[in-house]
């Protein structure tokens, strides 16, 4: 296998936000207690003209801009999401066409709850590492759903990030040292056909689901690389809320200085398939040469993908070619609960 890594990355977020207070107020709930419990203050809201496809296209275009490559050299495009706009019509084809990739490539839409994006990255690593193609692109994006009044309403958000994987050493902005996955059959979160909103196991989504898989995925990666938390400069984990993320990070021995750039949920909500890709993009925006990054995703159902990544000196050349994730977070406009319901199509007759 060739050494492979990231040659370009890009992110995208909707401009709209809703505060936890507005959601709680509509349902007569204690906003401060909810914010303390979840460590989520506000979340992104997709506009009426935004969906997983539009977010993926924008993120992919920014990744191409940073990579500086010919899009027709990309041999595979994978879009991971649990909110593809069509049940039958691939988002990946839309993204590729909009970015000038088509038609000489392979594509697929991926689903594995919130880790479909990182699964796509692993697939790209294999295709490029085997020499089958020069570049491959993976996108993780979602416009997540939460039923009115459900706890998910405070966190289910929208956003995504794209990564272009390559093998030319002089083009790498970060190289993959290794990857590891941990998967079981765990029914913590699900949505059947024709259902508008997912169901979840409440507290069951914690210890036997999120923590079991994230911690085992992390420990498996560290065992494979013979490392501990002290060997890394930064880390990012899946973040259904801020509390789970911080708890997992601390249990693994990571400090706030290591996990702070990856933690976006308090200001963004849970972007599902976009959560870890977005957290990683923010870390890359702040990273410097030789920084080492520890990554663990999580997807309900359930599984985790882990990565060990080292940043190269080329990072300083590409960050400012596109808008950073932090700038996207800062560019926002608040909406109230009524507008939120309208934009999310939750008013049903």
Curated annotation (Swiss-Prot):
CoA binds at residues 203, 243. SUPFAM superfamilies: Thiolase-like. It comes from the Archaea. It catalyses: acetoacetyl-CoA + acetyl-CoA + H2O = (3S)-3-hydroxy-3-methylglutaryl-CoA + CoA + H(+). It holds the Pfam family ACP_syn_III_C. The keyword Transferase applies. Gene3D superfamilies: 3.40.47.10. Pathway: Metabolic intermediate biosynthesis; (R)-mevalonate biosynthesis; (R)-mevalonate from acetyl-CoA: step 2/3. Its EC number is 2.3.3.10. It is an enzyme of class 2 (transferase). One of its GO terms (biological process) is isopentenyl diphosphate biosynthetic process, mevalonate pathway. (3S)-3-hydroxy-3-methylglutaryl-CoA binds at residues 30-31, 114, 155, 205, 238, 270, 300. The active site is at 82 (proton donor/acceptor), 114 (acyl-thioester intermediate), 238 (proton donor/acceptor). One of its GO terms (molecular function) is acetyl-CoA C-acetyltransferase activity. The keyword Nuclease does not apply. Keywords: Acyltransferase, Isoprene biosynthesis, Transferase. HAMAP family: HMG_CoA_synth_arch (MF_01409). Interacts with acetoacetyl-CoA thiolase that catalyzes the precedent step in the pathway and with a DUF35 protein. The acetoacetyl-CoA thiolase/HMG-CoA synthase complex channels the intermediate via a fused CoA-binding site, which allows for efficient coupling of the endergonic thiolase reaction with the exergonic HMGCS reaction. PANTHER family: 3-HYDROXY-3-METHYLGLUTARYL COENZYME A SYNTHASE, HYDROXYMETHYLGLUTARYL-COA SYNTHASE. Belongs to the thiolase-like superfamily. Archaeal HMG-CoA synthase family. Catalyzes the condensation of acetyl-CoA with acetoacetyl-CoA to form 3-hydroxy-3-methylglutaryl-CoA (HMG-CoA). Functions in the mevalonate (MVA) pathway leading to isopentenyl diphosphate (IPP), a key precursor for the biosynthesis of isoprenoid compounds that are building blocks of archaeal membrane lipids. This is Hydroxymethylglutaryl-CoA synthase. It comes from Methanococcus maripaludis (strain C6 / ATCC BAA-1332).
């Amino acid at each position: 296998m060739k050494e492979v890594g990231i040659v370009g990355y890009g992110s995208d977020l909707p401009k709209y936000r809703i505060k936890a207070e507005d959601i709680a107020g509509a349902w007569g709930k204690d906003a401060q207690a909810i914010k303390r419990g979840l460590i989520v203050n506000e979340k992104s809201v997709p506009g009426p003209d935004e969906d997983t496809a539009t977010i993926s296209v924008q993120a992919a275009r920014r990744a191409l801009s940073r990579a500086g490559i010919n899009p027709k050299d990309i041999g595979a495009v994978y879009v991971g999401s649990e909110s593809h706009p069509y049940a039958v019509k691939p988002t990946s084809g839309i993204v590729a066409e909009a970015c000038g990739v088509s038609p000489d490539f392979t594509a697929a839409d991926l689903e594995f709850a919130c880790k479909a994006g990182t699964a796509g990255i692993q697939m790209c690593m294999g295709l490029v590492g085997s020499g089958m193609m020069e570049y491959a692109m993976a996108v993780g994006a979602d416009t997540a759903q939460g039923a009115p009044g459900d706890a998910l309403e405070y966190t289910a958000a929208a956003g995504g990030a794209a990564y272009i994987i390559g093998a030319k050493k002089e083009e790498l902005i970060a190289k993959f040292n290794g990857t590891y996955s941990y998967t079981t059959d765990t029914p913590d979160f699900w949505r059947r056909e024709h259902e508008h909103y997912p169901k979840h196991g409440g507290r069951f989504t914690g210890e036997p689901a999120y923590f079991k898989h994230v911690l085992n995925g992390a420990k498996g990666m560290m065992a494979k690389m013979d490392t501990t938390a002290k060997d890394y400069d930064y880390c990012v984990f899946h973040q259904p809320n801020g509390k789970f993320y911080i708890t997992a990070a601390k249990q693994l021995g990571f400090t706030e200085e290591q996990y702070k750039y990856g933690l976006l949920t308090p200001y963004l909500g849970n972007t599902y398939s976009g959560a870890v890709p977005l957290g990683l993009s923010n870390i890359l925006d702040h990273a410097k040469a030789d920084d080492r990054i520890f990554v663990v995703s999580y997807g309900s159902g359930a599984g985790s993908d882990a990565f060990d990544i080292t940043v190269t000196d080329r990072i300083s050349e590409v960050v400012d070619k596109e808008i950073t994730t932090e700038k996207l977070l800062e560019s926002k406009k608040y909406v109230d609960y009524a507008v939120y319901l309208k934009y999310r199509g939750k008013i049903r007759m």
